[in-house]
Amino acid sequence: MSSDTRQTSGGNARSKRRLTDAVDEDGRPTATAEDPTSNPKRQRVSRACDSCRSKKDKCDGAQPICSTCASLSRPCTYRANPKKRGLPTGYIRTLELLWGLVFNKIQGSEEVVRTLLRAANIPSHLATMGKESEGSDTLLSSWKNSIVLKEIERLLTFLEQPEGDQERSARGEIDSPADAEESSVLSPETLEWQLPDSIAVASQSPLASGPSPVRLPRPSTTRLVRDSGTQTIPLGEIEDLTTNGSSHDRPVIASNSAREEHRLPPNPWPLLDIYFSYTQCWFPILEKHDILRTAFRQGDDDQYNSPSAAGDNAALWAVLALASIQQTSISTTRQLSDLPEDRPDPDQLYAKARSLIPTESGTYQLGHIQALLILSLIKLGQQDCAAAWMLVGQAVRSAQSLGLNDPSDATGVEKTAGRSKHVFLGCFVLETLVAAKLGLLPSLRKTDLTKVGLINEDGLEEWHPWEDQTGLRPIESSRSFQRGPLHALSTFNRLLSLMCILNELCCVRQTPANSMSYLGTLERQLQLWVSALPTSYRIDLQTVSTKPASPHIFGLEMMYEAVATAISLQLAVQKNERNGLRRASEGSKRLVSLLQAYMETYSLSATCPTFGIALTLGLPLPCMKKTAPWAFEASHGINHKLQSFSAHLATVWIHNTGSQRRPRHATQQGTHPRSPMAISLPGNNMRLTNLIEESRTGNLSTTDSYLSPTWMRTSNDENAVLSLPTPASSLNIASGVETNPTSQQITHQHRSSVVGKPNSALIMSDLTTPFPASGHHYQQTYDDASLHFNSLADIESTSSAQRPRIAPDLDALFDELASLDGTDR
């Protein structure tokens, strides 16, 4: 038999393929398998033989010998396992059969798997497919390292073997005693998956934290299966795992009752409106869209259980707790009975927010620090300063552990968040306030702020107008608000600069040596601060009824008066001058006037939780009883009344689940109630009387609408400095050394800093410049006579000392103030 050998053309002239034409006995050619006329359509075989695959020849897949190998007289085998794309053949069906076997043989397995599937946040794991982060998926790596996957791969390899090899392997598997023992336990009565007893009573699928024990017929082989797939724990260690085990070591399951606890209260949006209207405007530590996103995702179990959302959830519940207290106080102070009965319980919201904050060994996120600060505001409103001190201290340490106090530290992951700087600065503000109230030394100093810097003032919260969509304002209020810029961010920067002065006052109290010179320095710093304040950040009591100011502007003015009063008191104690207490008394009266204007504009329920501290910041501290006992005797009346007023403000923040009771003011001078929760006031006919009898005299009236202490007035030599225009955005905070300068040292100098000789006893840092010397971002303040800054930059040689205008009849004033909550006069 003859044959023609044809070679394909190529650059190397090598034979690629050899085709043989066969002829029959009559010499006529017969068509081969490669003849296009005999097989016009090309057929694809499922598997080629080993020889054709290695030589890249066409193979018809015939077994035991393909036609190509037969024509070329070469061995033909089908032993090699071909590499295919995608999943191995039978992989999906094997998984289906496996789960069917589990559901059929193990009681309760279907219910347990369903609850695990709901709690596992599967969409977040699917989102990592094809990404670099896929390799770090713990659930995926647990499956790939499990013995179950290895067993499935062994079964699939077995199916791909030739029939003869399959028969031999099958006989070997049957003869295996270990497998025979395992197959003997697969009866419907031997295996059972059960949920923990604490949630087994639930009628539907539970989602409570805790593992699922697997009961085997013999106690010695009982194991608790964990989600790693490769580790088992004896059943006796279940209790230790459920109490001490990490959430990463066991499935997260929660019961229906636990899911109800995670559900937001009915209609939480009014609570969010209250917070963002009256708290966010002066304490902008939150991103509004973060809170809204977290609130909308509360219905999604996967998003709620995500570890990355733990901090945001804690912050959200803290916001709801604070706002719910203010909302509840509306019904308490106004005796309203038509409020919905299903309104949230502030105590439960507070407990929920507190439970979401990790312990000392947990992992903290930025949202956890935000929650701690908001909860400390509640304690400040309740005037439980000891609890607020602990909460703020925990927030400060957590912020430092995340590296928020060191921008140069690149290891702080949380610092990439948009509000990390705001949160750290918020820690500084609250810690300084509580330390000043308790007479303690704050851990954060101005030097810590110089590393972080002030916040950027260009944002939506700076230029968006203030809006009130809540029910805190009286319904009959018809005052129209000017739709001007909110200036929340720049106001927060100015509050920070003011808190730097108060922060140093706390340190001066702890170092009596040479404190007089440093108190003079603080006077000068406060004078520069208020002189640089534009009129849009001041409160005009003459026009506030027709042109109301925003809540945070009221708060800034009240805090300034509180700091000025505290400095006046400290100066009087250091100089041992009884007459010096008159300045502190005047500051207290100005605070009361501001508070009256605020409550007339808004309401008692809308008061800030720091107002109580502002009222009592100028009261003598208990530590002054030894050095200046006359301070308590000389100001006994005003101390008693300010404490009464402060206790009245605390009624907003105290919620009693039983009878609504109001805290009774402290009856002893110089003492501050630790927690107003334990004291009460009788009834709704309480009257706040006049502060002191001598306040009724008419010598306190003045035409000046802006309030300012008399010692804040400038001299002739200082007027040249204070008449300079106010440049750019906000107050800079920088470290420096300053003493009380003389007028000759500052004449004709720019009001950027006042530098003198350093004192070796105590180095005080200064506000180097109220405004940097770049561009005029804000309006000029001191060259325009229409801005009514006569009381702030008056020339003592040409005008007499003036006092702020106070209502001549303070009895009527406080009766009116007490009746703002809806009680009978």
Curated annotation (Swiss-Prot):
Q: Which Gene3D superfamilies match?
A: Zn(2)-C6 fungal-type DNA-binding domain
User: GO CC terms on record?
Assistant: nucleus
User: What is its subcellular localisation?
Assistant: Nucleus
The cross-references to Pfam families, in alphabetical order and at most eight, read: Fungal_trans, Zn_clus
Supply the PROSITE patterns for this chain. Answer: ZN2_CY6_FUNGAL_1, ZN2_CY6_FUNGAL_2
Q: Name one GO molecular function term.
A: DNA-binding transcription factor activity, RNA polymerase II-specific
Tell me the Gene Ontology biological-process terms attached to this UniProt entry.
Answer: DNA-templated transcription; positive regulation of transcription by RNA polymerase II; quinate catabolic process
Ranges of biased composition (kind: Basic and acidic residues): 18-28, 165-174
The DNA-binding region ranges are: 49-76
Alphabetically sorted, this entry's keywords are:
Activator, DNA-binding, Metal-binding, Nucleus, Quinate metabolism, Transcription, Transcription regulation, Zinc
Please name the InterPro entries in this protein's record.
Metabolic/Drug-Res_Regulator, Transcription_factor_dom_fun, Zn2-C6_fun-type_DNA-bd_sf, Zn2Cys6_DnaBD
Q: Where is the composition biased (Polar residues)?
A: 1-12, 658-672
Disordered: annotated segments: 1-45, 160-186, 204-224, 658-683
SMART domains, from UniProt?
A: Fungal_trans, GAL4
Task: State the protein's purpose.
Answer: Transcription activation of genes for enzymes and proteins of quinate metabolism by binding to a 16 base-pair sequence (consensus 5'-GGATAANNNNTTATCC-3') in front of each qut gene.
Descriptive protein name? Quinic acid utilization activator
**Taxonomy-wise, where does this protein's organism fall, top ranks first?**
Eukaryota, Fungi, Dikarya, Ascomycota, Pezizomycotina
